Amino acid sequence: MAEEKTSCVLRLFGAPQGQLAGAVGQFAPQWKTQAQWKSRGGETLLALQAASPSGLKKAAQSLQAQFEADLYGAGDTSLAAAVVNALETHDRLLVCSDAAAGALLEARLETVPGAEKVFDFGALSYAHPKAGPQIEKRARARFKAEEPDAVRLALARAQAARRVVGSELAAGCAERGSEKVLVLSSKKGCWLRTVPSSDNAALWLLDMIRRA
């Protein structure tokens, strides 16, 4: 019989640090569980160490209940692997509407097993000899003679890519000064997030996809 664990590592993305500290501070004394965490950018690795398996379980369940949307995995699970798993589970295809988004996602997903089943790596979308120009044409047609700013064009491209390819999700990216504006289009609507160019935009975009 396998020995029950008294320690684990939880992985979160986008969890507010103040709320995380508050949640750990509310652990019941009888759980006899200590927590340490380290954050970089939006990602947090949180290590739990308990005196007993039951204490560990209760502490982990408490965090899961409070940070359900932010908690993406445990142990060695990467955010990219969590995204591929979510896409597979919901039978969704993800494409990119421009090379900038492709560069962010392809480097993260190329080594994840099964990624080719749920992500086109540009083959059906922006890098396709016919679909790519079609996406650009459809996107610019929305503005007629007007020259759109980079963010509006990225949003229009993402919406066009989803329709041209017939995918459930389409991601885009635009530069705006010292920032990157990340775009995600789905049948439900569109999401935008602005991150500093110095931040890891690929991880923020992956998190948007995971939550969609």
Q: What are these model-predicted stretches?
A:
Residues 2-17:
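Short glycine-/aliphatic-rich beta-strand segments at the starts of folded cytosolic domains
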Residues 9, 45-47, 181:
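Beta-strand secondary-structure signal
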Residues 35-40:
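Short beta-strand
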Residues 4-6, 31, 42-44, 178:
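A generic structural signal for well-ordered coil/turn residues at beta-strand boundaries
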Residues 42-52:
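A generic structural motif
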Residues 13-34:
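Short amphipathic alpha-helix segments
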Residues 26-27, 54-212:
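Short alpha-helical segments enriched in small residues
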